[in-house]
A protein has these predicted regions:
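Active-site mouth of glycoside hydrolases
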Residues: 52, 60-64, 68-330
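Aromatic- and carboxylate-lined catalytic core of secreted/periplasmic carbohydrate-active enzymes
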Residues: 48, 368-494, 501-522
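Boundary at the C-terminal end of the N-terminal hydrophobic targeting segment
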Residues: 43-47
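Catalytic-core region of carbohydrate-active enzymes that cleave or remodel glycosidic bonds
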Residues: 325-395
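Intrinsic, low-complexity polybasic segments
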Residues: 9-10, 14
């Protein structure tokens, strides 16, 4: 029996089908008409969402996004990327939790990479590490036993419909909630442990993929694996084309498997610690860059004949670095464990600059909240906190036992909602980084976005009170000091200013406070 899909606009044939299914009599005709109208209305509303132009850089300010007619920044604290490939993770519950917290972004791995349960990166309850035999890959299982992670080997020539049903449903459920999804197609493998679980490893498939050094997996020197990678990437891109809430990322942390030391954070450390993580700034080598360029072409060529074109993100490096050169067609520049300087050094690129992953600063919420305010008030476009409180069985984000090298909690998500609300209370598209207005802020570091002469978004990082000297034009002003933990107004004042220097006294605060300053009249 053919059931009309709600993922496309219903046809006349669908309408006739529904009437026949209702088997209406003359008496039931009115009831049938009402039910049919409800069906068509619901389906049409869904088709309208799917026909919206995909999220893009805002034409008036490319450091923010245009999404469904509004200028937006993307802020979240999301799960560890395994929502689709782990069938034991209830992503409906997860997305509902994100939506309830007022967050609008999540990152999703496309299924080509999985981790080792209770081992990889010390994550004990890892939704990117399905249990034995539970890895739901894009590829179908064969009839041959022997996959290293349990169950049968994979047949790389066949897709698994269950994966793509789950993938499309995830994108659709996120779309209903206004949540943008970064689909990460590939990832570095870091060491042999993850490579042992790869479906592309010849021991795990029936397709005789070439036996290679795993560090060559994401290079053009990977033998017949390259063709399977292209087919996989194109399939994920094609399946997602109708959705307006998708950004594609080429590869997660491409420098990790093929690093080139480019800079260090603290040059005063002694080798070898000076030159390794967490002090090194590494870039991918030339072999990696050539492969990434090819992968970007797969995305672009696959979408060329399709209705929609989506943004493409390049994961550039950890921490901060002035970008020397981006791959062709890149819209979003992703940094991990980012410093605010990742924005300031690259603002002139006129691309979205993203803090794409947090972690390795302990479990305390304060560290990640402060990172979010510092980054976004420097002109950042995206803040994506990796939240280890989302685990299988706790998809509402309430697993608060230690679980890996990062943080995450309902409290942190509430605090990030304060940041999102603060930014949305301003004319976001008119804001730009401002190094002039705050002349001095005693004992703290100041980050400022402003529409000069109109409104100012100021974040003070540290402990107060602080005396803040501002250079403001003449006018009538309202000033609200916002508690970055609760969103409450800790202090408000209105004042008339004749122009020039103006000193404001903050209230007491710990680990940061925000100031919303608006000029109401000359």
């Amino acid at each position: 029996m053919r059931i009309p899909s709600l993922w496309r606009r219903p046809s006349a044939a669908d309408a006739i089908f529904m009437i026949r299914m209702l088997r209406v009599s003359t008496i039931n005709a009115l009831r049938a008409a009402v039910l049919l109208a409800l069906f068509l209305g619901t389906a049409h509303a869904q088709s309208q969402v799917n026909r919206l132009a995909p999220i893009r850089l805002h034409p008036a300010n490319p450091h923010y996004f245009l999404f469904r007619g509004k200028a937006v920044a993307l802020i979240t604290s999301g799960e560890h990327y395994g929502s689709v490939l782990n069938p034991d993770f209830d992503y409906h519950r997860y997305l509902a939790a994100l939506g309830a917290d007022g967050l609008n972004y999540t990152r999703l791995f496309g299924g080509s990479y999985v981790e080792v349960p209770s081992k990889s990166f010390g994550i004990l309850r890892n939704d990117l590490a399905p249990g034995p035999g539970r890895y739901l890959a894009p590829w179908a299982r064969s009839d041959s036993p022997g996959y290293a992670g349990g169950g049968n080997k994979f047949d790389l020539d066949r897709w698994d419909p269950a994966f793509f049903t789950r993938y499309r449903d995830f994108l659709g459920e996120a779309a209903k909630r206004g949540i943008v999804v970064e689909v990460t197609l590939f990832s570095s493998h870091y060491d042999e442990n993850q490579w042992r679980l790869s479906a592309l490893n010849p021991v795990n498939n029936i397709n005789n993929t070439n036996s290679i050094d795993w560090k060559k997996l994401h290079t053009l020197e990977n033998g017949n694996i390259l063709a399977y990678q292209e087919r996989y990437a194109r399939q994920l891109v094609r399946e997602a084309n109708e959705f307006d809430n998708v950004i594609f990322e080429i590869e997660n942390e491409p420098w990790s498997d093929r690093p080139v030391l480019t800079d260090v954070i603290n040059p005063y450390l002694r080798p070898p610690g000076r030159d390794i993580y967490p002090n090194s700034v590494d870039l991918p080598d030339e072999l990696s860059m050539a492969w990434q360029a090819r992968a970007a072409e797969w995305i672009q060529k696959e979408e060329a004949p399709l209705p929609n074109r989506h943004l493409i993100a390049q994961n550039y490096c950890n921490f901060r670095l002035s970008v020397r050169k981006l791959l062709p067609g890149i819209d979003v520049v992703n940094f991990h464990y980012a410093y605010p300087e990742a924005v300031t050094l690259n603002y002139s690129l006129d691309r979205a600059i993203s803090y794409d992953e947090t972690g390795f600063l302990g479990h305390d919420d304060d560290a990640y909240r402060r990172q979010a305010w510092n980054f976004m008030l420097s002109g950042g476009s995206v803040f994506d906190s990796l939240d280890y409180s989302f685990t299988p069985g706790h998809e509402d984000g309430t697993d608060l036992e230690p679980n890996g090298p990062g943080g995450g909690s309902p409290a942190l998500r509430g605090q990030l909602r304060v940041l999102q609300s603060f930014l949305q209370s301003m004319s976001l598209v008119d804001l730009q980084p401002d190094s002039h207005t705050v002349r001095h802020a005693s004992g703290v570091a100041a980050r400022v976005l402003s529409n000069p002469g109109q409104e100012y978004a100021i974040y003070l990082d540290g402990n107060g009170p602080s005396e803040v000297m501002l250079d403001l034009p003449e006018g009538q002003y309202s000033a609200v000091w916002v508690n970055t933990k609760t969103g409450s107004a800790d202090k408000s004042e209105n004042f008339r200013h004749s122009g020039g220097n103006k000193v404001l006294q903050s209230p007491e605060f710990q680990n940061g406070i925000a100031l919303r300053l608006k000029r109401s009249a000359p």
